């Protein structure tokens, strides 16, 4: 009877809820004040969404498409705030309000879900100390336990991540493209959390982190480097992510033979640093629009999804634990890529540089938009 009831329940779930049954949290890669005011964000929560991510591009889009920020823009400008400070105040307000909306999920899941992410300024991507200072300021200003500060997984970002975790600040490590960068982020989390535990400042179980591993951008770059209609096109992004997930299990999952340096923390109730699949909107219209969700679903993961892709997944996605199989195939595909002369190391190195620039450009565009809006509103 229990089995029949279980099957009936699963049958009646939507795809987002089915993802949860497979161990994956679905987060929304979008935030705006209009979503908060209109109740749209609450509707996503009712579908089963359990978190939100943001970046400068998302805030730029929100400012461009709505007048809901106008009153605050005028108020902060009258206070004499510069455009960087104005943006930070607007972002802090939205993230704090979103965190309050997700707080019941955070409480219900014992700190393991219900997070809202905000990014440090992209211009600090190569500055360790500047990143630490800004992350501390954002953490204090928002003052919510279910917030994550996004820090890029650059060479300068990795030591910042370790320091922030050691202070009990939740971190979303972003712009991860390579297995090596992912591994560095995971060890920074473990080392920082070990320091936090030894400091006696609090329980390790209260600190959370995700490692945002980008997917579709890898396929776009690899596809451009391959001969036309090559059999590896559209496969390397997923293969790369699967190998990163294998590394995650090697580092954190004791039941699969891993978890060495993490195990002492695990015994205190510490959370694993979950892989978060980012850049999961399909860039090539020839590919299935939910492929990066369907193929990368499995235990202890998060997928942050743009609104359009979320709608597609809810309509015709195919949730299942596909992430737990296909490692030999992924390794074979990576080997075949090298054999045709395409270096995944070069691809991911260039993607990190381009990713930092893209976010920095979006940040500059956002600041320019604030200037233009103020010129009109004054």
Protein language model annotation of sequence segments:
Residues 35, 127-133, 151-165, 178-192:
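Active-site-adjacent beta->alpha loops and helix N-cap segments on the catalytic face
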Residues 29, 145-154, 169-181:
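Catalytic beta/alpha-barrel core
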Residues 2-39:
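N- or domain-start disorder-to-order transition segments that initiate the globular core
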Residues 270-377:
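Flexible, acidic glycine-rich loops studded with aromatic residues
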Residues 48-50, 143, 160-171, 206:
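Glycine-enriched alpha-helix->loop->beta-strand junction motifs that scaffold or abut catalytic
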Residues 55, 118, 149, 164, ...:
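Conserved, mostly hydrophobic/aromatic
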